[in-house]
């Protein structure tokens, strides 16, 4: 459960992300594909090369979804319901992949926002991404 302090930290960090959410999403996807090659199996139709339009496009979707989640931090299930349906019923993404992408997102944010990525912000973002992952996998059960 996200505390009021966690919510404040997440919103402040995401304000720093600003218009870079799509770029950071794409970078996190590239990190995930390089660090966890089995995740590539969900994207057989993508050119997974650095900077490819498909990875950039999906990175923008990831960034937009997270921006939406931050905006609706008090109602993540409502905000992410359609995305949860898509990943559970149509795409059938293995739930572990959300944890892998979350880790890569944290690394990406730490790399781009080093002075803002304090231990408290790190913990809050980790809890937030875990909450998002939980919502996205909630319909698998």
Swiss-Prot record:
Nucleus among keywords: no
Protein's UniProt keywords contain Nucleotide-binding: no
Subunit details: Heterotetramer of two alpha chains and two beta chains.
PTM annotation (N6-succinyllysine): residues: 7, 11, 16, 40
Similarity field: Belongs to the globin family.
Residues found modified as Phosphoserine: 3, 35, 102, 124, 131, 138
Residues that hold heme b according to the record: 87
Protein name as it appears in the record: Hemoglobin subunit alpha
